[in-house]
Amino acid sequence: MNEPLETIPALPTPPAPPPAPVITENLVSPVVTYTLMVISIIVYILQAGTQQFLGYDIPALLGMKVNDLIIQGQLWRLLTPMFLHGSILHIGFNMYALIIIGSELERRFGHWRFLLLYFLGSFGGNVFSFLLSPNASLGASTAIFGLLGAEMVFFYQNRKLFGAGARRALQNVITVAAINFLIGLSPGIDNWGHLGGLVAGLIFTWFGGPKLNVEGLYPLLNVVDERGLTDQLLGAGLVVLFFATLAAMKIMGLGPF
């Protein structure tokens, strides 16, 4: 007589894997980046046009960094050089850097903070050039180096969020800055302006740049910026105070400048 087959209990159904997290980040379009590029191109066309038809580069005469004229009170020359360029190659290189670096930074910094950063980088760079270089100068590279400094601090302060990607990005930015400083050793390039822009970007972003955190209930998560307008104004105020003090010392003949 056949024995009944032993019944094998069914294995329990494995639990469903947890849903993948849905992470949203409030990114903006790089409107300011493209606006700055358009303004710079228009100004360069005016430079070329006045040079061609009048024999003088009127925008450069009115706005480039000239130490003696700044000492005489033309303080706008600590900002306006960022919209002026000396050649097609000069503006082409700077606008390419602005698009590559600026468009990504603006997405996370927001329009207002990015614009503030750009102007502060230019201000810091032109002040350092005013202090340490007797040569006239112009170009957006002061502001571009401000963006590089900001990018360094951004990835460093948010390294836990971005993980290994932050380390790679930080290494890339430092490498790009180092290469450009080496290029800046060539005659006719204002490395002091580059250094000042970098320092301004570092200071502003350390105190006022985005410091990101993840909030929400899993799996719906949001990337939020812990810093607000007060932090941005603090960072900007420190940059202005530091560089304006140095410029004032130079103008009044104080200190080692």
Report the location of each language-model feature.
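C-terminal transmembrane module of polytopic alpha-helical membrane proteins
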Residues: M1-V28, F181-F257
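Specific transmembrane alpha-helix
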Residues: G124-V127, N135-N158, L195-G208
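Interfacial and helix-entry/exit segments of alpha-helical transmembrane bundles
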Residues: R167-I179
